């Protein structure tokens, strides 16, 4: 593996005018057990993955209290505390996990307050750099949920506010209450349903964090749909893996894009970081339209 691997090769992005991060981050959902439930199969390996990510130039780490639940946040603190000064930790609240496979909404203000304060404790932070509403709750007015995050920010517990799994209309409602510095929606080569949200983020200089940037693993083979076959051909032309080509496509797709591929493997992490140095040509991007 190239000794010069560095996430900084992807360039930088500024969150909220004051948090500069390298534009290839790390999603910490996979440092948990099967089904994003419980401890990872090998805790020591999960710790090494997190530490290696930082050594390879990752300065933005995304997690959520529901990953494990609580496991991912605890492992981040175990692996990285005391944090280097340039490390930005983002977490999320608003989904609860009563059991494996269950993802239930709870974005009531009281729950978000309790969740944020618990995340502060687990992450061993005085203030969360970026706190994201994990998803709008159909039973709670969006303004109530975001309003509580605004109060937490005014109390110094949150530095910046982001949202996840939102439409343009929902994002506009949030922005009427407070500046939104990031949006985290599902987005990858095959799933571009959030193209309109990405376009809005570009107009407003809001960071766009694509979750499932590798299509939940579907991009590993480069076979299947026409888009994936085209991705396989682009990967072959650059001598890289299909997964690396998928990350490179995201980085080239928009300057507000901040991919956060996750993994529980050091080897896979290094492959992902190598994608920061890949430059796709206009011809490549046309082939992947």
Regions found by a protein language model. Give the residues of each.
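Acidic (Asp/Glu)-rich catalytic clusters
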Residues: 16, 55, 77-88, 120-124, ...
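Alpha-helix N-cap and loop-to-helix initiation/capping positions
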Residues: 38-45, 71, 75, 103-114, ...
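Short, acidic/polar
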Residues: 39-53, 107-123, 167-173
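A short acidic, helix-capping loop that chelates divalent metal ions and anchors anionic groups
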Residues: 32-36, 96-103, 216-220, 268-271
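Beta/alpha (TIM)-barrel catalytic core signal, keyed to glycine-rich beta->alpha loops juxtaposed to Asp/Glu
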Residues: 7-12, 136-289
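N-terminal binding-site loop/beta-alpha segment at the start of enzyme catalytic domains
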Residues: 1-87
